[in-house]
């Protein structure tokens, strides 16, 4: 209703100003500004829904104000360009319409009415309401009801008798199981759901709407609100250290806790969270690659669900035979947005909707088949009678190719339980949320019926029942939940551990690199994650007087304040203000101790803008002084004009990447010498090893042969045509996720370059 009202007010404002207000520059500018704000707010809301399917929330605000790196980002480029073009077109059209009668006399009354209607349209828009609520949640000091409803459970289960298998289905919400809406989409897992305790109204709350957040909510009974963006949790050394979560209780009760997934455990700090709360046995992409049958059978995120669930079954079987009390948690990935992935062992690899194949539905149909097969193995085993199986979605599906169809339904998370000791078949329509999952499981296992803000749906009352406005209530509790991190409010002394890549201050530890914004009684950590912008881009958003401490590789800050360290990959510490003075210190000891030293200084606006502009230079445009191309730092030597076909810097160098260009091309500003030696330190990937690799300068071509290990080879070139471009053409680029950023599309690797040097041998 508010959406229709806001649109009506917007149109009324446009029409009244265009046809009645007449000419006046000030009123025109004011009205256009407010109407433009309405347009921006609604386009932001549309973009937010496109990226995550959940309006403007904490995760969206972070994602839209930082780089959109991560899973499937290429799928969002065209929509992003379309939104930008639409914004320009709408502003142009709006300005033209408002000035239609600019030659008519000005009328103050109609101008005022048009402006008031424009302000009303902004106030009535859902986008403005969502942003206002988020801002309020940041400014509140907490909610008095938090202390009333937050409860710590007992640390042990008296006389535990049941083992636990807990399956997180990536984005596998209950909506997919509506057979009327999506016929025969989930026949196998749907049948199992109907055999157990099926909780049909599990809503999604703020701070529970992405994987690590859903895991925290389901095990600790609290949303993932933190003094930093949630997916950057990989940088912390402990996770809600004061909380008692399900894993802690299980461990204290004699359980061995296992977690198995196909993706890298470090992503979003799942390893830190699990290790902080009772899990001693973790298996992710790195741990599984030495034990799975086919290490090359992977998708963009890691191993396919059939592989992961096969390994989970092996763990279940071995642990059950041992007689040891255990919990086994596993997380699937094949249903990850935007399209999902199809395991090769599925019987159904295609699901049609609206008369055409739909990749996301196909992935769901396949993944649920794999999950059902895993569960049926457990049910058929002699150990099922001592086992509780839990199946839940980690969160609602984000924007995938099925999302517009999901949104036509009443959406809820999946949560059902199969008890081997006491089979129960019932659909429970009680209102609940993800925070209630852990408490419900704990209740079944014989423990308390509460964890944090979560309550057992079998014997307690969920916050979703207590509060009609439970989403707003949870947001009001955000400051209380952030305080549970016990995060320091100041930094004076700190220690950088060079070998462990950690920084410690005021009792907290963070992985490097790290950026800190320091103010009175607040230290805001800005870690670098797969979904965040590089730290230098984040620093560029600081105000001129913001105090910062930046710990990163020296070369990343050297171009600004320490040119002598431009090629150093060691750790450096910079601190100061962008508009004032900055220092850079080289970390030259294994345990390097530092102190913060922020000086009051006159702000230099010109210096500030210069620093910001330099920080925002993209990697490939950075230039440094050197007599060779060093590939493990960003940028290129000053002599290089541009280059292509080369991937991002890694600790050892860079790969060629045929996804970015069929050949490696390095174009120099000036012609290369008439005679020169080309000294190449490199290695080959896959089938490119021990094969001739063409290297061209102008009309002359040499061949390079590399092995899998790094070697240095010198090629002799004549350059009579004064060519200025070096071309290297790997013969057999290999599509692989080797060394790739989690969630990115595979790269096509050819050769790995460490250094290229041009040596003039003209007499």
UniProtKB/Swiss-Prot annotation:
Entry's EC annotation: 2.7.8.20
Pfam families: DUF7024, Sulfatase
Cellular component annotations (GO), alphabetically ordered: plasma membrane
Known catalytic reactions: a phosphatidylglycerol + a membrane-derived-oligosaccharide D-glucose = a 1,2-diacyl-sn-glycerol + a membrane-derived-oligosaccharide 6-(glycerophospho)-D-glucose
Pathway assigned to this chain's UniProt record: Glycan metabolism; osmoregulated periplasmic glucan (OPG) biosynthesis
Alphabetized InterPro entries for the sequence: Alkaline_phosphatase_core_sf, DUF7024, OpgB, OpgB/LTA_synthase_biosynth, Sulfatase_N
Membrane topology recorded in Swiss-Prot or TrEMBL: Multi-pass membrane protein
Name of protein: Phosphoglycerol transferase I
